[in-house]
Amino acid sequence: AVVDRRQNCMETVNIGDSGILLIRDDQVVWQTHPKQTGFNAPLQLSLQMDGSAIDVTPRADLCNVELCKGDVIVVGSDGLFDNVFQEEIVGMVKTIHDGNRSEQHMADDLVSLAYRNSLQSDLTTPWSVEAERAGRSYRGGKPDDITVLVCIY
């Protein structure tokens, strides 16, 4: 994602299962959607050991999104979005935003929540909901790398 303050917009490219939420007035007003070939199978651009490409079909989503003052942009890896429901992210952003905390504090708190949830075995998470939809019995979080960036426009 690239934020252009002169044009009041954000340009995004999305492939795979990382994601972006645009939160305005305590609501998600825009978001990316995971690009997957099936459950737990995100689209990837990669090379084999011999240098030949695997699935290089250009299927990325390209978007240009208008921004307003006070918008909160949350960019996260699947470690965030597999372990924390969107409503929880919005709630945390609202609580932290109302408390005048920095973007870094917001990102740190979201990473901490995702990490705690990833270790739980008795929790309903976005990951466990998707697993069930795919016909798999799974409960709890999904241990994974967790990366979060937050920008207040």
Could you tell me what each predicted segment is?
Residues 1-69, 144-150:
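"…together with the soluble PPM/PP2C metallo-phosphatase catalytic core" -> "…together
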Residues 54-76, 80-153:
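C-terminal catalytic subdomain
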